[in-house]
Amino acid sequence: MTFYDHTAIEPKWQAFWADNHTFKTGTDASKPKFYALDMFPYPSGAGLHVGHPEGYTATDILSRFKRAQGHNVLHPMGWDAFGLPAEQYAMDTGNDPAEFTAENIANFKRQINALGFSYDWDREVNTTDPNYYKWTQWIFTKLYEKGLAYEAEVPVNWVEELGTAIANEEVLPDGTSERGGYPVVRKPMRQWMLKITAYAERLLEDLEEVDWPESIKDMQRNWIGKSTGANVTFKVKDTDKDFTVFTTRPDTLFGATYAVLAPEHALVDAITTADQAEAVADYKRQASLKSDLARTDLAKEKTGVWTGSYAINPVNGNEMPVWIADYVLASYGTGAIMAVPAHDERDWEFAKQFKLDIIPVLEGGNVEEAAFTEDGLHINSDFLDGLDKASAIAKMVEWLEAEGVGNEKVTYRLRDWLFSRQRYWGEPIPIIHWEDGTSTAVPESELPLVLPVTKDIRPSGTGESPLANVTDWLEVTREDGVKGRRETNTMPQWAGSSWYYLRYIDPHNTEKLADEELLKQWLPVDIYVGGAEHAVLHLLYARFWHKVLYDLGVVPTKEPFQKLFNQGMILGTSYRDSRGALVATDKVEKRDGSFFHVETGEELEQAPAKMSKSLKNVVNPDDVVEQYGADTLRVYEMFMGPLDASIAWSEEGLEGSRKFLDRVYRLITTKEITEENSGALDKVYNETVKAVTEQVDQMKFNTAIAQLMVFVNAANKEDKLFSDYAKGFVQLIAPFAPHLGEELWQVLTASGESISYVPWPSYDKSKLVENDVEIVVQIKGKVKAKLVVAKDLSREELQEVALANEKVQAEIAGKDIIKVIAVPNKLVNIVIK
């Protein structure tokens, strides 16, 4: 039986594409543009897994589709190659992280090329290449010049095992580090910060301009966390001190019965009384060991210590004890809160635990039993009594401003971005600290500031990066003899990935980040495909940098990515025992359709789970390509289900996709191809062109493949295949299975040219409608014949055709026809006796 020999055909076409630079980005200014971007990978030692190609295949199908539709297509790939794993490997082995990274990139590239993706490799970028990070450093110097990069002594999330501080976004909900799962402690350190907060409102507003999943927009909105309310100033009794509180509910001020400061608040030591000093100091020490997420966990037990001082409630003169508690963060709001325990669950629990007053100021609920957190009319609130929430807030803000003890205020949950890392394998921050106390940016003419090669890359232990050990790089002298030290912190991995999509547009430019005209031509990115796990971090950082570059006149658009699509996760197969514990696949055997533990004999339940090394359920694309072919892997991953769904990997599904491609190969190579159109496939062919065109455009790849299958089934029923339909079908399947598409195109045309730029097939609307219909002929209410007739025949014509039919004539011979009822396009009913 004829079958598709992927082992010969796929390498042949991969070599053809490489030799002919088939996918070089088009530059014809008269054509529309299409910029299809993948989230570039970190080139790990493990190589690609089958989850990577899912998103890559989607953008590749779109890129091939748009090329055939006459677009200039920019479809690049590169490497997000700085980062901790390479440094960790280097420390463990003594090898240079650059060598390890280069080997990993070569392996990733081999794997990617084996999958037939149509990348323009002339535009490849690597974030660890000095010619690339020259411009990462240049962007940093611009941030510095604009006052958006600054140094501050800040409590950081310090991870002892990693020897570095990490950003808030990299701390998991359980208070451990995203990388490695290590404990995170709070520690004050000199750090570089980026003032992303200066862009909070624009980052929020401009989400309206982009076509992104609403869930991702919501995650960014929540992270930015805009709140409108009021600042209220509280004086500390018997002192000249005061503190400010931000509240979204100034209308509940009459119910504020105590205040809470963050343990790190600057006022704490100044207002703590002598008899409370030891307890306060102990509590501050304990709080410093917890991450922000652990401190604000709603489920945790409430802890706190009284400072011994009282604040004066400005609205009624009542004394309010001032406490410190770790659920209040110095970095959020003003680092101080007014507690209204009657109407806030956390304040209520705290008040109950420490026997503090609870005064209801909203009607409804029983505050002895629980906090009342719904809306109600105001009570116990003097001039606010009887007012609803909106009216009371407005009136209280007016009162605060008139009395000079508060004002209306908008705040954001978003914090400035902690940008420095105490590691070696990252972009050096281009700043020099001089002995006269000044700091300057490295001039543009001296960029890139190249990372020095050194064997000594262990963390210094002092909080500085290993670069502090490289004396000849570290120490510099100015023309006037003043000595200086280079900044030893390096940039986080997020730096290079915050702008890489811009460098793809003009990757070899030595004079500037990218040419303005080219940026105008290609921005914004038309489709960006990647995992939803980057919803806040990477996407927010990239949007921030893009807006800064927009303000500098470097880029012409406010937003970088017009449309974002998150592919789902490809899950592996896992097995669970009766206790619910996961069992590795090499400990499982299949018998009679059931699964059993090899050692215990216990029957196991099969369930999908994230692929992991420990479960031994990771599928390597190399193995799939070798056994089934790249086209099979591509078609299978697109046919599994909707692109954004998480679906379990299945060998049976893979085999089904391979059989489909074999059927396609046989159809084109063994069926007689004719120049005459019998018309039998008119409708299904035109339906297929229409459906595949629309569904690819909407990224509904699974339903597009289903329609291709419909055509193959219909075509296989015919003796011959019309040449134009054969060619059109091959064009439709080529974006999904490009090696097969190229091979079959040569079978049909022998053109010697790639199918890639052959204009996409069009469909004939008139052929979508059936020209013939089947009608039934009933005699005495029973169906006696079925006739295929031209559509829309008149009653008279229909009657004539029915009565002329041989079967009908045999039934009515010798009978009297009483009447004939003809319903066009449906039936003919003959009444006889």
From Swiss-Prot:
UniProt entry tagged with the keyword Cytoplasm: yes
Residue ranges annotated as motif 'KMSKS' region: 610-614
Catalysed reactions, as listed in the record: tRNA(Leu) + L-leucine + ATP = L-leucyl-tRNA(Leu) + AMP + diphosphate
GO terms of molecular function: aminoacyl-tRNA deacylase activity; ATP binding; leucine-tRNA ligase activity
Biological process annotations from GO: leucyl-tRNA aminoacylation
Keyword annotations from UniProtKB, A to Z: Aminoacyl-tRNA synthetase, ATP-binding, Cytoplasm, Ligase, Nucleotide-binding, Protein biosynthesis
Residue interval(s) of motif 'HIGH' region: 41-52
EC numbers, comma separated: 6.1.1.4
Residues spanning the signal sequence: none
Binding site for ATP: 613
HAMAP family: Leu_tRNA_synth_B
Similarity section: Belongs to the class-I aminoacyl-tRNA synthetase family.
NCBIfam families: leuS_bact
Name listed for the protein in its UniProt record: Leucine--tRNA ligase
Native source species: Streptococcus pyogenes serotype M28 (strain MGAS6180)
Underlying gene: leuS
